A protein has these predicted regions:
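Hydrophobic face of amphipathic alpha-helices that form TPR/SEL1-like repeat modules
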Residues: 82-89, 117-124, 152-160, 189-196, ...
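N-terminal leader/linker segments that initiate helical-solenoid repeat arrays
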Residues: 2-74
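Ankyrin-repeat and related helical/solenoid repeat scaffolds used for protein-protein interactions
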Residues: 165-233
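Terminal, low-structured helical/coil segments at or just beyond the last alpha-helical repeat
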Residues: 222-255
Length: 255
């Protein structure tokens, strides 16, 4: 990872990316999402969920399963994704609609979590045979609709050359979009780009602290740990006593 971290540090040194925290909003169904010109690739009926890190779906709240199903039947994309998540988590479907059918309906309406999940399933199913164009399209669409993890996934794919041709410029472009969409993990990647071991790039502990702080405010506990390390080792500027007290309070127990 050294080379890309060096590139991040060199390109972002002295620049600040505005922090725009991400919140997935409940939305009314949107028109069916346009498909790429390539042939459509649909997930199989019973994919293997074991190696797929699915995003957390919104909870039912005070609604019953029957109420959520009624909303899904009426075209509510979020409810459709909630049913997918419910049945994919091991609950037996009490109708003839499998989990994947609800996922497909939600994705076709442009629901960001459904687009992201569908893309991950397609990538997992293809393995080392390359990434379906629809999966890339779905990740881009999910990111455009505010789900920052989709941009981060695209960053990793193009950085690692996993199923696509590795491209540093493309990877960094998606990383920047993830930051702009409020991804704490993306800010943390940039923070590490200013630390030793970044492949020969500039070392700037204050810049590392700045980006780690943005990541921490977006919920990254790894960023909190990095901040504490920088302060304990007197690597960053500031009143370390007060800052350490504050950030140690932000560190949640791991158990």
């Amino acid at each position: 990872m050294g080379n890309i971290l060096s590139s991040i540090a060199q390109r972002l040194l002295g620049r600040k990316v505005e922090c725009q925290p991400h919140r997935t909003q409940r939305r009314t169904p949107s028109p069916t999402i346009a498909q790429p010109s390539c042939s459509t690739v649909r997930p199989q009926a019973s994919p293997n969920w074991t190696h797929i890190d699915l995003p957390q779906a919104p909870t039912f709240g005070m609604r019953s399963l029957a109420e959520v199903r009624a909303e899904a039947e009426n075209g509510d994309a979020e409810a459709q994704y909630q049913l997918f998540d419910y049945y994919a988590s091991g609950h037996k479907a009490d109708d003839d609609r499998p989990a994947m059918e609800w996922l497909t309906k939600a994705a076709e309406q442009g629901y960001p979590l459904a687009l992201y999940t569908s893309a991950l399933i397609q990538i997992e199913e293809k393995g080392d045979k390359g990434i379906p164009p629809q999966a890339i399209f779905y990740l881009q669409a999910s990111g455009e609709r505010g789900f920052s993890d989709a941009y981060l996934q695209l960053y990793h794919l193009y950085y690692e050359g996993k199923g696509v041709e590795a491209n540093e410029d493309t990877a960094l472009g998606y990383l920047r979009q993830a930051m702009e969409a409020g991804s704490g993990a993306a800010y943390l990647i940039v923070a590490k780009g200013f630390l030793p071991g970044n492949g020969g790039g500039p070392i700037d502990y204050d810049a590392a602290y700045y980006y780690a702080e943005q990541a921490a405010h977006l919920g990254s506990q790894q960023a909190v740990e990095l901040i504490i390390h920088l302060l304990e080792e007197n690597l960053a500027s500031g009143d370390h006593t007060e800052l350490l007290t504050y950030w140690r309070r932000q560190l949640r127990p791991s158990h």
